[in-house]
Design a protein with these regions (language model features):
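Conserved acetyl-CoA-binding loop-helix of GNAT-fold acetyltransferases
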Residues: 1-15, 37
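Terminal substrate-recognition subdomain of acyl/acetyltransferases
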Residues: 18-112
Length: 112
């Protein structure tokens, strides 16, 4: 459908990007678990890889996914460091540390 076409075209619009980072709602924390599972399936069919990391952003929980761009990709650790850096720059360090938490697959919090 159109969503898959849009997602497939996105890397071409981000020149120089190794990957596109996607935050998808965690099914086990979602109001609509079935919809969240379908979204994860959609992203997987489009080539996105679940890093195994989760993110707590304000009051919502997300899985961190990586969509490779131009045959390149980011490993899970680097992807999450980049995500943390993005939020820190956009929100400012104080708000970022207050409202954003990243967790490794084993559940331990990572403070980049």
């Amino acid at each position: 459908g159109i969503g898959a076409k849009l997602l497939a075209a996105l890397p071409a619009h981000e020149e120089g990007a190794k990957a596109i980072l996607i935050e998808a709602e965690c099914p086990e924390k979602a109001d609509d678990e079935a919809m969240a599972v379908r979204r994860l399936g959609f992203y997987a069919r489009c080539g996105a890889v679940d890093t195994g990391w989760t993110e707590h952003l304000f009051d919502a929980w997300f899985r961190v996914l990586v969509l490779p761009a131009k045959g390149e990709t980011l490993d899970a650790e680097t992807a999450n460091k980049e995500l943390a850096d993005c939020y820190s720059r956009v929100m400012g360090a104080d708000k970022w540390r207050r409202y954003v938490r990243l967790y490794r697959p084993d559940g331990t919090e990572e403070k980049f």
